[in-house]
Amino acid sequence: MAQVINTNSLSLMAQNNLNKSQSSLGTAIERLSSGLRINSAKDDAAGQAISNRFTANIKGLTQASRNANDGISLAQTTEGALNEVNDNLQNIRRLTVQAQNGSNSTSDLKSIQDEITQRLSEINRISEQTDFNGVKVLSSDQKLTIQVGANDGETTDIDLKKIDAKQLGMDTFDVTTKSAKAGAEIATGTKITVDSDATKQADADVTGLAKGQTLVSGTDADGKSAYFIATKDDATGDVAYTKAKVADDGKVTDSGTDAGVKNPLATLDKALAQVDGLRSSLGAVQNRFDSVINNLNSTVNNLSASQSRIQDADYATEVSNMSRANILQQAGTSVLAQANQSTQNVLSLLR
């Protein structure tokens, strides 16, 4: 090797190795301090892209799990309201069974009907006012879509139905109206003409009605013959009309009434079945959301583990790398000092 002064190749070599060890030490310290093997794309470009996609999926699935929990909360809120509707219907049914007993006076029936009316009003209030996060869950038929995945189209629907007295077929429910049974013979009593403006014409002759039930004949708005059973309440003077079919012998063959009057218990059973159907649907969707949440959590765990293997730093490896780089730094600094002294030997030739 030539003895030169202008270029110290040994020093340059030592500096280059010292820079390499310095870079390795910096990388090891960065990874140990951040806990990440990939701190920028230069560390692992492909790994960084894969890890970023995992991050998007993990965050989306985590939010989807929260969405499913919100769906459970909505279903629970709705079912709680339906439970109150069910309780009111059960009490109305009990009162209706009580009203079917022939020992009840008109006053008793009126008291029973008053309570039934209040309970039906409460059902309407529940329908109108039950709210979850601004959504009226029982005020209309609607479908709520819950996002339960990280991608488009990954949804679950909650079908909600309007539940009020009208939808349950009970908006005209009345236990105070008594109708004649088919085959019963009705006294003609005082003659009353009932035409298309039935109410006003009948009111004028209320005092002439015989006690109990009286057969009323007249014509409807189309000019056809029509028959009604008029029942007078002696206490109040009120008259209730029930449309009827009458045979030639004067016997009632059928008395047409509202469903809530003709078959009140069947009407209530149908209403209860309607509420039970919606409650069953809500219970099923809650179980479905539970399954969705379990699956989402499992997927998030697996994706997180996969992301960790790509992105997270292995501390055992990085500590070893840091120790190695630290030793090389110390050795490189010492060697560089020796290399810088090598040019001093050239000066001895000038002495």
Swiss-Prot record:
Q: Keywords, A to Z?
A: Bacterial flagellum, Secreted
Task: Note whether Secreted occurs among the keywords.
Answer: yes
Q: Which compartments does it reside in?
A: Secreted; Bacterial flagellum
Q: Which GO terms describe its molecular function?
A: structural molecule activity
InterPro entries from the entry?
A: Flagellin, Flagellin_C, Flagellin_C_sub2, Flagellin_N
List the GO cellular component terms.
Answer: bacterial-type flagellum; extracellular region
**What family is this protein classified in?**
Belongs to the bacterial flagellin family.
Q: What's the stated role of this polypeptide?
A: Flagellin is the subunit protein which polymerizes to form the filaments of bacterial flagella.
Q: What is this protein called?
A: Flagellin
Q: Which organism is it from?
A: Serratia marcescens
Q: What is the lineage of its organism?
A: Bacteria, Pseudomonadati, Pseudomonadota, Gammaproteobacteria, Enterobacterales
